[in-house]
Amino acid sequence: MKQMNKLITGVVTLATVVTLSACQSSHNNTKLVSMKGDTITVSDFYNETKNTELAQKAMLSLVISRVFETQYANKVSDKEVEKAYKQTADQYGTSFKTVLAQSGLTPETYKKQIRLTKLVEYAVKEQAKNETISKKDYRQAYDAYTPTMTAEIMQFEKEEDAKAALEAVKAEGADFAAIAKEKTIAADKKTTYTFDSGETTLPAEVVRAASGLKEGNRSEIITALDPAISKRTYHIIKVTKKATKKADWKAYQKRLKDIIVTGKLKDPDFQNKVIAKALDKANVKIKDKAFANILAQFAKPNQKQPAQK
């Protein structure tokens, strides 16, 4: 959901600017910094920063967060957020906090990011479920679908470690499963996964590679990017089992529907339509002309978003 990740980035960037902007009207003379012969107030800081790109993104993210919390707060539980957080933490093991810090995140801000992502995902999926799915849509999804497969997957933080492991599995008589258990950085040392081409808990690059391999074949090094924390990981996979694909798409109709609906999360136009609907329902009005254009991407054709007087 790269489009949404771009929007949500502002939740943790320049949060201070947004906080200050919220209290600017009543505390605009509050002193933030003092020096000989001068001071810097909340108003000074707000006026200096509000036109920056980061401030624009931060305000947009704050608006979306407030709107979706109001409309969908009870649709995402703390348990779901913790589960998603733990899943990523387990993936990176002991280096997770370092990875977060390198991305400008803390555990708390990353959890906020996860929560907002899930709120928007819920809204997008609900809207997608109400869309009519044609036979053409089903057939296209079927053509791209690979049914259940089992693979041994090892993961690395460093490309050089992945290269060393690749050389090891290429050696004559090498035991891929044993090497994977020894070398993978997964916190629980899990290496065996069963999934289909619609899997979303594994990196998309890994799923695509596995879908394209024949049973018994091994990949080269696969580079995956986690857009939430802008971190690359490296993977080597071996497909050990693949189910035979049935000839009739109707045999997979329920699963194909899930995949089509989930695919809407990657459609920026559909996302924008859902967000625009939520913003319209919330009757969002921009009061400061500095932020007049932050909702432009969600406006209907020929509709402008002027600042309110």
Swiss-Prot record:
Gene3D superfamilies listed in its UniProt record: 3.10.50.40, Porin chaperone SurA, peptide-binding domain
Lipid positions (N-palmitoyl cysteine): C23
One Gene Ontology cellular component annotation held by this UniProt entry: plasma membrane
Family: Belongs to the PrsA family.
Designated name of the protein: Foldase protein PrsA 2
Localization of this protein: Cell membrane
Record field: catalytic activity: [protein]-peptidylproline (omega=180) = [protein]-peptidylproline (omega=0)
Lipid-modified residues, S-diacylglycerol cysteine kind: C23
Disulfide bonding pattern of the chain: none
Gene Ontology MF terms in the entry: peptidyl-prolyl cis-trans isomerase activity
Source organism: Streptococcus pyogenes serotype M6 (strain ATCC BAA-946 / MGAS10394)
Purpose of the protein: Plays a major role in protein secretion by helping the post-translocational extracellular folding of several secreted proteins.
SUPFAM superfamilies in alphabetical order: FKBP-like (SSF54534), Triger factor/SurA peptide-binding domain-like (SSF109998)
Domain PpiC as annotated: residue spans: 146-241
Keyword field: Cell membrane, Isomerase, Lipoprotein, Membrane, Palmitate, Rotamase, Signal
Signal peptide, first to last residue: 1-22
Membrane topology category: Lipid-anchor
GO biological process, alphabetically ordered: protein folding
Entry's EC annotation: 5.2.1.8
Primary location group: membrane
NCBIfam families xref list: PRK01326.1, PRK12450.1
